[in-house]
Amino acid sequence: MSGNSCDKVQVRQVRKIGPTRRSVSGSYQFRGKEAIQYESTLERDFLIRHEFFPNIVSITPQPVEIPFIGDNGRAYTYTPDFLMSLRYLDGEATQHVLVEVKPRDLWVENWRAWSSKWKAARRFARNQGWSFKIYDESRIRDRALENIKFLDRYQRFAQAPGHTDTLLHALYKIGPLSRDALFAHCGVIAGDERPWAVAIWYLLATRRIDCDITLQLDGSTILWTHQNG
């Protein structure tokens, strides 16, 4: 898909989200820059999860209005929750995904009633060279989100430069290593692992090193730098 596919429509937030009594609404500071509005805790968790992945270029809330005809023959307008732009591994092309965030019990219960607007969203996305996906808890509140929330607390931990520099130097020099193998290479003494583990979590949280965030974080976790990943 071309990185220019967004040029076919004007992509911007078309609907502002106000306070709601039925769910939690607010704004999330995406990568410390733009504030992205959400209107449920599930939408907030979607933003937290996808902020971590470097291939996510941007997320636009309430991005487009899509006209559709309901089963009753009346005209309506549907606004998906987000437009997510992802960069392919080659770093050149960009993929765009229209996203609807919905709890599983709601979309299962209302699938037939909502099918007209979702079919319209798929048609609209296809015409733009995009795709349309529905995200429920199974795609958002997974192991990756648990790990991301666990690491978040370590972003603000003060680190001894000697620990982080030693770990980074080893990964730059040798390449991907498990956490246990990295500790062994750096001469970490048994019983003294705690500050070194905190340094690992800090480096992961601040994205100076990487791992497969979808897997459990433990001694077998493979770590690498962006240089040798």
List the model feature ranges, each with a label.
Residues 1-229:
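Electrostatic, structured charged patches in enzyme active sites and in nucleic-acid/phosphate-binding
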